[in-house]
Amino acid sequence: MNKDNHHIKVSLTNNPYEIVIGKNSLESIGDELFNIGFREGLKVLVVSNKEVSDHYGDCIIKSLIKSKFKPKLLIIKAGEDQKNQSSIDLIHNAAYEARLERGSLMIALGGGVIGDMTGFAAATWLRGVNVVQIPTTLLAMVDASIGGKTGINHSKGKNLIGAFHQPRLVLIDPKTLISLPSREFKAGMAEIIKYGVISDLELFDLLERQENIADLSNIKEKLLLEIIKRSAKSKAEIVIKDEKESGVRAFLNYGHTFGHVIENLCGYGKWLHGEAVAMGMVAVGQLAVQRGLWNEDNAKRQKRLIEKAGLPSNWPKLDIESVLSSLQGDKKVKNGKVSFVMPLKIGDVKLFNNISNKEIRECLQKIS
C-alpha cells in the first residue's frame, strides 16, 4: 500500500469502503484488493473501453496477476448511447465465460458510463457480485464512482433502470487525466462546481481564485489533488448520511433535473453529461432568483465560474412544452410535481417539491 495515497472512509452501516486517491495508485490495485480481504485465486473481470484499456489495461492486469488473482479483460464500447441492456448482456456473457462466482469481482476501469454499466452488471449477476470502481475521468472520480448508484438508460429517459450497489473500493489515480480529452475534463469541472454550490463555499472560492480551471495543463498537481479530494469527500459525506437517496442525497441532483432533460431531448451524445449539468445549474439558478431564494449576484457568480471552466452556460434551443413533458418522466416526480434542488446561497441548497409548470415556463422563457 502506497503511504502517499489519501484515504477517505465511506462509513456505511452495511457496506463500508474506502476511496483511495494517489498518483500511480493504479500500480497498487492488487495490493489494495489484498488489503481489503481478497485472496489468491480470485476471479476478476475487468471491464473497460478500448481507449482507456490501451493506456492502463496492462498496468491493471499485471498488478492483479502479481497478487495471484485471475483476471480477464473485457473491452466494450463506451458513450452514453451504449448505456443499454445490450451492453449489460455483453458483460454478463463475459462473466459467465469467466465463471464468476458470488465472491468474485468486477472492476470498472473507465469513465462514468463504464462505471454505471459495470456496477449494474455486478448488481444483477448472481444477484450481486463484488465491484471495484477505478474511474479515469474527472467526472467519474468526483461523482459517478462514489455512492453505489448504477444503471442504464431507457428510451424514455436517462438512468431509469438501475440499482444501488456499493463498491468494495474506489481507486483514483489522477495521472489517468493526462489522457483525457479536454472537453471531458471540462465536463468533470461541472460536478466540482456543483459541490461548491451545494455544500462547500471554500471549494467554490478556491476555484474562483484560479486564473484557469478549464485546462488541465494549467492546474498544478497539488491543486488538482486538493480539488479531487474535497469533491470526493463532499460526495462521501452526503452518501454516508443518506445511502438510498431518501433525504439529503437528493442535493447531489442539483442541476441534473434540467440537465437530464437536455440530454434526453437533444439526444445522448450531443452534450456531455457535465455540460448538460452546467446548463442545468444556470437554469435552476434562475429559478431560484425568481423565487427570491438567492440573489442575482450569486446567480451571476455561478454562471461566471461555469464559463471560466469552459462549460456552456446558455440554455439550448428546446421547445418549452417538450421540456415540461420530459420533466414529468423524471425519477424524482411526486404526484405530478417536479422536484428541484435550489440554492439558498453558495454552499447551501434545499429541495423544493412544489414547482409549477408556470414557474418553469417563466424561467425557460427568461433564459432562452
From Swiss-Prot:
Indicate whether Cell membrane appears among the record's keywords: no
EC top class, as a word: lyase
EC annotation? 4.2.3.4
Q: InterPro entries given for it? A: Dehydroquinate_synthase (IPR050071), DHQ_synth_AroB (IPR016037), DHQ_synth_fam (IPR030963), DHQS/DOIS_N (IPR030960), DHQS_C (IPR056179)
List the cofactors.
Answer: Co(2+); Zn(2+); NAD(+)
- Which residues bind Zn(2+) per the record? 191, 256, 273
Pfam families recorded: DHQ_synthase, DHQS_C
Primary site of residence: cytoplasm
Q: Which transformation does this protein catalyse, written as a reaction? A: 7-phospho-2-dehydro-3-deoxy-D-arabino-heptonate = 3-dehydroquinate + phosphate
Q: Could you tell me the Gene Ontology terms of the biological process aspect for this record?
A: amino acid biosynthetic process; aromatic amino acid family biosynthetic process; chorismate biosynthetic process
Q: Which domain of life is it from?
A: Bacteria
Q: Which HAMAP family match?
A: DHQ_synthase
What protein name is recorded for this chain? 3-dehydroquinate synthase
| Natural source organism | Prochlorococcus marinus (strain NATL1A)
